[in-house]
Structure formats: C-alpha cells, structure tokens
Amino acid sequence: MAFPEPKPRPPELPQKRLKTLDCGQGAVRAVRFNVDGNYCLTCGSDKTLKLWNPLRGTLLRTYSGHGYEVLDAAGSFDNSSLCSGGGDKAVVLWDVASGQVVRKFRGHAGKVNTVQFNEEATVILSGSIDSSIRCWDCRSRRPEPVQTLDEARDGVSSVKVSDHEILAGSVDGRVRRYDLRMGQLFSDYVGSPITCTCFSRDGQCTLVSSLDSTLRLLDKDTGELLGEYKGHKNQEYKLDCCLSERDTHVVSCSEDGKVFFWDLVEGALALALPVGSGVVQSLAYHPTEPCLLTAMGGSVQCWREEAYEAEDGAG
C-alpha cells in the first residue's frame, strides 16, 4: 500500500532572540543578508559598512570610504563584491576580501536610498531622493551611468531586481515595474508614499509598504490587490518589509518597537514580535531558513524559531 504524503510542517516564525550585535557604528540604517544567508551587512550613520557572521556575533570586516551615513548595501551573488549608497550621494563598489573601494560612482543629485546588484553583479542599480534610478556598469571606467530611469515624480525609496525586471517604489505613491525583456513599464498607484517594495519568493506577487501604515500584496502581472495587512505603525520613516522564506507570511518593521508577521493568505496577524522601545528601522529575512535580523538604534538582533538549537559556538 502507498503511504500518505507527510504533511508539510507548519511554518515556524523566528521569535527567539539568539544574538544581539552592538554594531559600534552609530545608528544602524539598514541590515542585509548576503545571498546565502551566512553573513550580513550593517549600514552605519558613522559612514561605515560592516560585514558580520550574525549567528556567531563576529565582526569580519569594516568598510570605510563613504563621506556621510551609509543608507543601504547589497552583496553580489558570488560574495566577492559589495555595493552601498548613502547620504554623500555616492554609490560605492567594494572588494569584499580586501575591504578596498573598487569604484565610486557619482551622479545622483541627492542621497542614495537604495542599491542592488543585477543577478550577474555586472550592474549596480541605485535609487535616490533625486527621483531617479541609475544603472552603473561595474566593469566600465566611464563615470556616467549606462542608463537613467527618471519616471518617478518624487524620491525613489526602494529598488529590487529579478532576472529581467526592476521593481521600484517612490514617494510619489507609485510602484513601477520595468520589464527589461519587453521594454515595458508597468505602474500601479497606491496613493500613499511608498517606503519599501519587494517581489515574493515565487515571483508572482509584489509587496508594497507605505506611510498609511498599510502593506499591500499585488498581483505582479495585473496589479490586482490580493491582500492588505494592518496593525503596525509606519507614518514617518522608511521601513523595510518582506516575505518569509517560504512566502507564508508578510513581515514588516514598525515605529512602535515591534516586527509584525501576518498570514499571507488569511491576512490575520500571526505575531507582533517585541524588539525594543524605539523604531525598528530595518529588517532582513534569511533566504532559506526562519531567521530574522532586525535593526534598532545602534544594534542588530538575530532571531530564530523556538526549536532552534545553536551549533557549537554559534549561540
């Protein structure tokens, strides 16, 4: 007789604080996992970028070269390069191993809110308060961007990249998706200034957070509103949102010191995770495991599921 398929385990949410990193770089403006989730980057108001092993709590390298606070960073797919952007209007390409600045791209007229590599890490995309997205060729010596996307009518707060698409959120209340294969631009009007936008892991949906304390799940192709998620507070700051590693939950920072988890399908609040007494400025979700990083003030907290047991020396 055939045995029944085992039921998939219900998703576990990261709610056990495993580590707190005192980052020593002023206020942490953003925290980001690298591509495989083994390391993380922290962006500091003291102009530095730091690379950590978050589970062990060890600092691996400090990157100095920005002239003002660092606001966002990303790692390349092969872990050899980093990019960052900040209040000095510059986009910086770093060599991970040496800690050296490889290139510094200038051209934005205001602070750089968000940076991403394309999948091959040959191009850096940067979104700025100057209402533009600029595409910089990592291999060229030319100082100007290879392309500028200037459809936004106000600052660009968020840029994400999939294999042939760019997703951008703007303070003008629109989320724009550039299909590079088709050469088309799709735009959806949310109405409230957008603070963060991202693709679902399966690539079917986009998640958008805005300053009306609401997250919206949209069908990527049609723009249809699939769900709304409320209960957190986001009225003043650029806060991160994302989906959990299996697309089961919507996750958002909040200005009241918590991280909120909602069931993606039901829309019901699943967990309000108390982080501290300030604004949870940034978060990052592990690509394959129930592991969350949160940034508040000058520290980063690493969270795992309740059943998690740290390996030797990692707890």
UniProtKB/Swiss-Prot annotation:
Residue ranges crossing the lipid bilayer per the database entry: none
GO annotations of cellular component type: catalytic step 2 spliceosome; endosome membrane; lysosome; spliceosomal complex
Positions of WD repeats: 23-62, 65-104, 107-146, 151-188, 190-228, 231-272, 275-313
Record-linked Gene3D superfamilies: YVTN repeat-like/Quinoprotein amine dehydrogenase
A biological-process GO annotation: response to lipopolysaccharide
Domain of life: Eukaryota
Coiled coil: none
Record bears the keyword Cytoplasm: yes
Keyword Cytoplasm: yes
Subcellular location: Cytoplasm; Lysosome; Nucleus
Subunit field text: Interacts with EGLN3/PHD3. Interacts with ERK signaling proteins MAP2K1/MEK1, MAP2K2/MEK2, LAMTOR3, ARAF/Raf-1, MAPK1/ERK2 and MAPK3/ERK1. Identified in the spliceosome C complex. Interacts with PARD6B and CRB3. Interacts strongly with GTP-bound RRAGA but not with inactive GDP-bound. Interacts with p62/SQSTM1.
Role: Molecular scaffold protein for various multimeric protein complexes. Acts as a module in the assembly of a multicomponent scaffold for the ERK pathway, linking ERK responses to specific agonists. At low concentrations it enhances ERK activation, whereas high concentrations lead to the inhibition of ERK activation. Also involved in response to hypoxia by acting as a negative regulator of HIF1A/HIF-1-alpha via its interaction with EGLN3/PHD3. May promote degradation of HIF1A. May act by recruiting signaling complexes to a specific upstream activator. May also be involved in pre-mRNA splicing.
Listed name of the protein: WD repeat domain-containing protein 83
Organism: Homo sapiens
Lineage of the organism: Eukaryota, Metazoa, Chordata, Craniata, Vertebrata
Gene name tied to this protein: WDR83
